[in-house]
A protein has these predicted regions:
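A short, basic/flexible loop-to-alpha-helix module at the beginning of a structural domain
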Residues: 2-19, 73
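NAD(P)-binding Rossmann-fold cofactor-contacting core
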Residues: 25, 33, 39-64
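A short helix->loop->beta-strand "cap" motif at the edges of active sites that frequently abuts
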Residues: 43-46, 103-107, 126-128
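Rossmann-fold NAD(P) dinucleotide-binding segment
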Residues: 72-121
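Rossmann-fold dinucleotide-binding core
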Residues: 110-197
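Active-site-proximal catalytic alpha-helix in oxidoreductases
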Residues: 164-222, 226-246
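NAD(P)-dependent Rossmann-like dehydrogenase/reductase catalytic/cofactor-binding core
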Residues: 223-342
C-alpha cells in the first residue's frame, strides 16, 4: 500500500485565512479547544464567531472572551470558514436546516469526522469547499498539547474542491489549530470512517466479548470476583500495555513481560488462525458499514437517542450489558472495595 502524505507547518500558508470570518458551530469538546488554539495562533478575536444555543457552552465561550451568536442563520451568512463541531448525530438536522440555505457559495466547511460526509447526510453546493481536519485526540488534549507547544495527530482531506484551492485552505486550517506541528496525515472521510466504525462495531465488541468470556471461565474455575477484576483490568495493566504499545511498538512492548508471559502470548496468538475474526471484520466492514446499513439504522434511532429512560435504545443496551456476570461482579467488588479504589 502507498504511504500517506504527511503535511507539516511549512506546507501551510496562514495568509489564506487573513481577513476571513471564521465561524465555529459548537463550543464543546473539539469546538472549545480548536477555537482557542486558532485564536492563540493569531486569528483576531473579532474574526471568530461561536454559533451556539444560549446555554452553558455559550456562557463558557463568552467567559473565554469569544463573540457568540445564538442565531444560526446570521452566523451561516457571514462564514468564510465554518467548523462543524457539534455531535455527528445532530449535524444533519442543524447544518442542513439552519446553515445550508444561508451559507456563502464559496465557504469552506470543515468537518472533524468523516461519517456524515461518507453517508451523504450533509448537503453542500458544488461551489463550496468541504475539508476534513480530524484530530485523533479528545479536545482537552488538542488544547493541552497546543499550549505545551506540541502537535497532535490529525487526519486531513479534501472531500469537495469547490473553489479550486480547498487543499491549501485545509492545510491552513490544520496549521492554525496546531495540527501540522507534528504532521497531519493525508486521509479521507471514507478511510477515517471505515477505521472508526470497524473499531467501534467489531474490534472493541470482540475485546469486550473476550474479557466477558475469560471472566466467566475463570469465575467458574473458582477465581474470586475481587481477584478477577483486579487481574483483568482494575490494576490498569491493559491500559499500561496499550500505552507501551503506542510508545515502543505493538509487539516490542511484550519484552516488558515475564519470559513465561512472552512465550504464552506469542505462542497463543500465532496459533490462532484468525479466520473467524477476519470473516467477522469483513462482514462488518462491507455488509454493515460500507453498505450504509448501520448508518440507516442509526439515523432511524436518532430521535430515540435523545430520550430518557426505557425509550432510549442505548439505555436498553446498557441494561443488558449490566446483566452480564462480569458487570454484576464488578459492581459488587466496587461497592465492597470503595475505599481501596479511591
Ligand atoms: P460535543 O458533544 O462536545 O459538542 C457539544 C457542542 O455541540 C456544544 O456546543 C453543544 O451546544 C452543541 N450541540 C449539541 N447538540 C446540539 C444541537 N442539537 N443543536 C446545536 N448545537 C448542539 O462534540 P465533540 O466536540 O465531541 O464532537 C464534534 C465533532 O468532532 C464531531 O464531528 C466528532 O466526531 C468530532 N471529533 C470528536 C472527537 C472527540 O474527542 N470528542 C475527536 C475527534 C473528532 P448546545 O448543547 O449548547 O447547543
Amino acid at each position: 500500500m502507498p504511504s500517506a502524505k504527511i503535511y507539516y507547518d511549512s506546507d501551510a500558508d496562514l495568509a489564506l485565512l487573513s481577513g476571513k470570518q471564521i465561524v465555529f458551530l459548537g463550543f464543546g469538546n473539539q469546538g472549545a479547544a480548536q477555537a482557542q488554539n486558532l485564536r492563540d495562533t493569531g486569528i483576531p478575536n473579532d474574526k471568530i464567531l461561536i454559533a451556539n444555543r444560549a446555554d452553558a457552552y455559550a456562557d463558557d465561550a463568552k467567559a473565554k472572551g469569544f463573540i457568540v451568536e445564538h442565531d444560526f442563520e446570521k452566523a451561516a451568512a457571514i462564514a468564510d470558514v465554518l467548523f462543524v463541531l457539534i455531535p455527528d448525530q445532530v449535524q444533519p438536522k442543524v447544518f442542513n436546516g439552519s446553515f445550508v440555505p444561508h451559507l456563502k457559495e464559496n465557504v469552506t466547511i470543515v468537518i472533524a469526522s468523516g461519517y456524515n460526509v461518507l453517508f451523504k447526510l450533509l448537503e453542500f453546493k458544488s461551489t463550496q469547499n468541504v475539508v476534513m481536519v480530524a484530530p485523533r485526540m479528545i479536545g482537552s488534549s488538542v488544547r493541552s498539547l497546543y499550549v505545551k507547544g506540541k502537535g497532535f495527530p490529525c487526519f486531513v482531506s479534501v472531500e469537495q474542491d469547490g473553489t479550486g484551492n480547498a487543499l491549501p485552505v485545509a492545510l491552513a486550517v490544520s496549521k492554525v489549530i496546531g495540527a501540522t506541528k507534528a504532521g497531519a496525515i493525508s486521509s479521507s472521510a471514507r478511510e477515517e470512517t471505515m477505521m472508526d466504525l470497524l473499531a467501534e462495531q467489531a474490534l472493541w465488541p470482540n475485546i469486550i466479548m473476550l474479557f466477558r468470556e475469560a471472566f466467566n471461565v475463570l469465575q467458574k474455575a473458582g477465581c474470586s470476583d475481587e481477584a478477577l477484576c483486579y487481574e483483568m483490568w482494575m490494576s490498569k495493566e491493559p491500559a499500561e500495555i496499550f500505552e507501551r504499545a503506542a510508545e515502543e511498538g505493538f509487539i516490542t512492548q511484550l519484552k516488558h513481560h515475564s519470559t513465561c508471559s512472552q512465550f504464552g502470548q506469542l505462542r497463543g496468538a500465532l496459533a490462532l488462525d484468525g479466520v473467524a475474526a477476519r470473516k467477522h471484520f469483513e462482514d462488518t466492514l462491507y455488509n454493515q458499514i460500507l453498505s450504509g446499513k448501520f448508518s440507516a439504522e442509526f439515523s432511524r434511532l436518532e430521535d430515540g437517542l435523545e430520550k430518557e429512560g426505557d425509550e432510549n435504545p442505548l439505555n436498553e443496551l446498557y441494561r443488558r450489558a449490566d446483566e452480564t456476570e462480569l458487570a454484576k461482579a464488578e459492581k459488587r467488588v466496587r461497592a465492597r472495595l470503595a475505599g481501596l479504589l479511591q
